Amino acid sequence: MYILVGSVTTATRLKKAAEKIIGFPAYVVHTPSALNQGRCSYSVRVDDRALNEIRKIAGDNEIPIRRIYIERTVNGERVYDVVS
């Protein structure tokens, strides 16, 4: 799952909070070019199972999320579905 945020600083804050609270590893990564619409080029990558926890963590820590995508593979190509 990719969580798009406004800046690398915000991505780092979300990553640290997520790892501390849910225990899943989270990574600050470059946003895939298919998702980057001229905005921040960094997002947080975390396990899809953490969706509800990520939303709660972001809300509790006043971290604005621009969009959340789930990645899947269709016919050998990556496809991104908008979650929110």
Language model regions located:
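Short, conserved beta-strand edge motifs with alternating hydrophobic and charged residues
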Residues: 4-6, 27-28
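Short hydrophobic/aromatic-enriched beta-strand-loop microsegments
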Residues: 24-29, 65-68
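Helix N-cap motif at beta-to-alpha junctions
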Residues: 7-11, 46-51
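C-terminal structural segments of small proteins and small subunits
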Residues: 48-84
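Amphipathic, hydrophobic secondary-structure cores in small proteins
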Residues: 26-44
